UniProtKB/Swiss-Prot annotation:
InterPro entries: AA_transpt_TM
Major subcellular location class: membrane
Gene: Slc36a2
Keyword flag Endoplasmic reticulum: yes
Membrane-spanning segments: 54-74, 77-97, 144-164, 193-213, 218-238, 260-280, 293-313, 341-361, 375-395, 400-420, 442-462
Protein name listed in UniProt: Proton-coupled amino acid transporter 2
Length: 478
């Protein structure tokens, strides 16, 4: 069949005959994605988000509650090994995102499509692979990726609800003992109030209104507000940390190998934003600048992670707690950190919700008439919000259950699938042995994250089953 392949000059396109696998021909004819215009023609859109808006969303997609647990993670790795490992993980995560974008752009050119999401890219990668079995089961690639994305992103939404309720509850319960003066290096909870589940329900109306925002350009306002509130809170934390940095000579450069898996499991999921990469690229006015924005955004995030993780461990040493906010004095300045994070996470919910909504809602809307499209759209959004709130309320130790599920889905999405996708995408064009080796090593690293995270979550679930019920904890979930 004949498709259009862009030449070096953007004004010239030459026809190229490709011998496509039979399964690829079927997928191309059945795929519901728009096919009018090539990727180069659609790279500039009259309506879309700007480069700055894309950067804001990208930074917000990465910067969640996980950064508060990184000082403890650095403790489990060592004051030298921890920051170095964070740097390596940031580079690998960024590289895998670039792989996904390149493969998606490759199939856009090859199949003359304006855009592709994560699931479509994997599906076409399998369809063009040299293996007949993979070609015949290419549709399962899209289904598996969509399932992982839905589970991961809605899982984050569930944990965000728990985080919102717990932090607001801590501030309210400590209000009688919170002072203006910041001397005591401790956050205490003295006055019991209503159950945290009632706090969760109190956020439901606000979250319901937020998810009704369906435009990424409008969501930029909320992402920008979230970034500002979180950055201000991190500045407050940082200025307290650097006031009194003790001698670091007593801290181990490299911690015990027995505790390093705890660092690995915490850190690897802090870089989880691959689910929003292609939706952001697809919505850009000029997608050609996306790789630069992606590198800039991940550089900002990695630098923040290393700074907070290393400085937090340097300041508090072995006394560092699971969330660095628990090491702050019980005064209004540092209690405001929790309130700022509540605002930030509240705004972040809508962005994390955007990905599963874009997968589920179009499938449902396609089954009804145009008259009912909007009511069905809004109803599904409201139902999904209620579902995340219900799961947050009903499931004991939700953080461990989601860590178990995330160990599989997050590792697969961020580290296992992208390098394997690169191999099957470029295999027929003579991919170098060095690239294959690099991709294999990254996939092995992702599989290690899956094994370590699964073991850690199962171990904690077993321990929690033999102890009194504990409140949900969110410091290890991004």
């Amino acid at each position: 069949m004949s498709v259009t392949k862009s030449a070096r000059s953007p004004q010239v396109a030459t026809p190229l005959n490709l011998d496509l696998p039979e399964s690829a021909k079927k997928l191309q004819s059945q795929d519901p994605s728009p096919a009018n215009g090539s990727s180069s023609e659609s790279s500039k859109k009259t309506k879309g988000i700007t480069g700055f808006q894309t950067l804001v969303h990208l930074v917000k997609g990465n910067m969640g509650t996980g950064i508060l647990g990184l000082p403890l993670a650095v403790k489990n790795a060592g004051i030298l090994m921890g920051p170095l490992s964070l740097l390596v993980m940031g580079l690998i995560a960024c590289h895998c995102m670039h792989i996904l974008v390149r493969c998606a752009q490759r199939f856009c050119h090859r199949l003359n499509k304006p855009f592709m999401d994560y699931g479509d890219t994997v599906m076409h990668g399998l369809a063009f692979s040299p293996n007949a079995w993979l070609q015949n089961h290419a549709h399962w690639g899209r289904r598996v990726v969509s399932f992982f994305l839905i589970v991961t992103q809605l899982g984050f939404c569930c944990v965000y609800i728990v985080f919102l309720a717990d932090n607001l509850k801590q501030v309210v319960e400590a209000v009688n003992s919170t002072t203006i003066s910041c001397h005591k290096n401790e956050t205490v909870v003295l006055t019991p109030t209503m159950d945290s589940r009632l706090y969760m329900l109190s956020f439901l109306p606000v979250l319901g209104l937020l998810v009704f925002v369906r435009n990424l350009r409008v969501l930029t306002i909320f992402s920008l507000l979230a970034n500002i509130s979180m950055l201000v809170s991190l500045v407050i934390i940082a200025q307290y940390i650097i006031q009194e940095i003790p001698d670091a000579s007593q801290l181990p450069l490299v911690a015990s190998w027995k505790t390093y898996p705890l660092f690995f499991g915490t850190a690897i999921f802090s870089f989880e934003s691959i689910g929003v990469v292609l939706p952001l690229e697809n919505k850009m006015k000029d997608a050609r600048g996306f790789p630069t924005i992606l590198s800039l955004g991940m550089s900002i995030i990695t630098t923040l992670y290393i700074a907070i993780g290393a400085l937090g461990y340097l300041r508090f040493g072995d006394d560092i707690k699971a969330s660095i906010t628990l090491n702050l004095p019980n005064c209004w300045l540092y209690q405001s950190v929790k309130l700022l994070y509540v605002v930030g996470i509240l705004c972040t919910y809508a962005l994390q919700f955007y990905v599963p909504a874009e997968i589920i809602i179009p499938l449902a809307v396609s089954q009804v008439s145009k008259r009912w499209a909007l009511p069905v759209d809004l109803s599904i959004r409201l139902a999904l919000v209620c579902l995340t709130c219900m799961l947050a309320i009903l499931i004991p130790r939700l953080d461990l259950v989601l860590s178990l599920v995330g160990s599989v889905s997050s590792s697969a999405l961020a580290l296992i699938i992208p390098p394997l996708l690169e191999v099957v995408t470029y295999y027929g064009e003579g991919i170098s042995p060095l690239t294959v080796t690099k991709d294999a090593l990254i996939s092995i690293l992702g599989f290690m994250g899956f094994v370590v995270g699964t073991y850690q979550a199962l171990d904690e679930l077993i321990k929690s089953g033999n102890s009194p019920a504990l409140s949900n904890s969110t410091m290890f979930i991004q």
